Amino acid sequence: MGSNDRASRSPRSDDQREISDMPATKRTRSDSGKSTDSKIPYLSQPLYDLKQTGDVKFGPGTRSALLGLLGGALPKLSSEQHDLVSKAKKYAMEQSIKMVLMKQTLAHQQQQLATQRTQVQRQQALALMCRVYVGSISFELKEDTIRVAFTPFGPIKSINMSWDPITQKHKGFAFVEYEIPEGAQLALEQMNGALMGGRNIKVGRPSNMPQAQQVIDEVQEEAKSFNRIYVASIHPDLSEEDIKSVFEAFGPILYCKLAQGTSLHTHKGYGFIEYANKQAMDEAIASMNLFDLGGQLLRVGRSITPPNALACPTTNSTMPTAAAVAAAAATAKIQALDAVASNAVLGLSQNTPVMAAGAVVTKVGAMPVVSAATSAAALHPALAQAAPALLPPGIFQAPTPVAPSLLGVPAGLQPLQAVVPTLPPPALLATPTLPMTVGGVGVGLVPTVATLAGAEASKGAAAAAALSAAANNAAVTAANLSENIKKAHEKQQEELQKKLMDEGDVQTLQQQENMSIKGQSARQLVMQRLMRPVDSRVIILRNMVGPEDVDETLQEEIQEECSKFGTVSRVIIFNEKQTENEDDDEAEIIVKIFVEFSAGAEAMRGKEALDGRFFGGRRVVAELYDQGIFDQGDLSG
């Protein structure tokens, strides 16, 4: 009985002994149908939160070119290295913000200068549009007669009549300046050829009008987009409602505004009306011009200036400092993200690795990749002593496996002194004059490993590892290059500001005479002065006539005389007042006559023929005039 029991139990004990000798994984699979208590249970889900307890060993997988791109096999950073990475990121972002802020400031200043220049030209053009020339005036007429005849078209600002102290009479012409350009335009249209004092007067634009003709054309073209009419000679007792009730019979009116007078309930006798369509505007002009309203004949014409054309330019508003810095930071961040995406795509689009004897060398675009030995040296100072020099950009070298040593010195190697890298980080030498941004973190001092745009989880790890490895190597050269980079930044900013100021200057003849050559533009300016001048097609005639001899037939006579030497394109008669005060009536006036031919040879023949000739008892002085200055509308030479 007892022997049979022992015999029956012995096979079971052998089975248990065999099961105990099996591995845990096999034991679990063999008893899959039973509930067993295994020491290592089956993992149904992958583990994401893993803690590193040992050192990272570099195996054959480190030879892959995608290792650096995908952020694999990266060492764990110490707290000190994390601080260095944070400082590098902060410094790089500050430099990027400074550069973007400087560019924004220069662009804003350039825009302000262009706006000011445009406003000045516009104001000068509008001032010329307010003036008309009145010639062939009878010597019996006085200034009061001229004022009464031209007042119905708009308020007159000033009347400048030439006066001869010898004969005690005026010289037969005058300049009438209105407060608004529409008054001068109506006077030009309706008073030219009118009979005054037994003579038909001549009304036209001043002779210096062509130099601003381009801006004037732009203003008039802009005014055509508005269906506005100008109404003058309005009775003082009529109000805006009265004028609107009369003119709204031609069509719907958008607004009706009379110019405010000296008091609250008075007006200056003119106003503007804007219709909803062009047809109503044309009908109002045709029907209401010279219409008797309240005992005064209305003067109605189309407006030649847009609304608020005479308004003073607003002061240039500057962006608040906080807003400018925030905008610069946002711009720098976007540029960094764009760099991450472009570098990642560039790295993946390159060829496959090429095997070489002794080492594996891989071309990875133009991005510097940190070697594994350098990354290991960041964690182990002992390994940093034997770390190789940084390779040129785009070269990746596989490390030699090193057995760990308890003493901190690799086995099989003699203790060596610290080796200084023979090549500085490529980013420090590639662009020394600009803040350097690397990858997607905006670091401007050291290169980083580019990552895929979609691999958000590996961005931070890859950038941090590359920064920590290269930060130690960059410390050697950063001290020497920091001063050079600072000087380069200052030099570039100075050049940009100087170029901006040079573009904003409007050089007249007087400024060109007092010009001094300095700075980097000296060579260019000297070469420009030594270049062969362009053949001029313009001659200037001085001392040909006096201000009293200028009339409506003078231009035709000069053009007919100069036609003997070639084809005359145009003749400009310019009255230059020898004072800066435009309202000074006693200032001396010099008449300059500019004649433009179709060819330079014709201008030379005209200059040689007319120079020294006598015209009306005066000795004419004929000279060639600079073509470039003439094309710019500068007649002050």
UniProtKB/Swiss-Prot annotation:
Residues 1-41 are annotated as: Disordered. Residues 130-208, 227-305, 537-627 form the RRM domain. Its main location: nucleus. It comes from the Eukaryota. Gene3D superfamilies: 3.30.70.330. The keyword Phosphoprotein applies. CDD domains: RRM1_PUF60 (cd12370), RRM2_PUF60 (cd12371), RRM3_UHM_PUF60 (cd12648). GO terms for cellular component: catalytic step 2 spliceosome; nucleus; precatalytic spliceosome; protein-containing complex. It is found in: Nucleus. Expressed in all germline cells and within the follicle cell. Belongs to the RRM half pint family. PANTHER family: POLY(U)-BINDING-SPLICING FACTOR PUF60, POLY(U)-BINDING-SPLICING FACTOR PUF60-B-RELATED. Splicing factor that regulates oogenesis and controls both mitosis and mRNA localization in the germline by regulating mRNA splicing of a subset of genes within the ovary. Probably acts by regulating the alternative splice site selection of the otu transcript. Also regulates the alternative splicing of eIF4E1 and grk, while it is not involved in the splicing of par-1, sqd or psq. Involved in the alternative splicing of the bicistronic pre-mRNA encoding Kdm3 and CG8176; required for the efficient production of mRNA encoding Kdm3 and Kdm3-mediated regulation of rhino-dependent piRNA production. Interacts with enc. However, given the cytoplasmic localization of enc, the relevance of such interaction is unclear. This is Poly(U)-binding-splicing factor hfp. It comes from Drosophila melanogaster (Fruit fly). The gene is hfp.
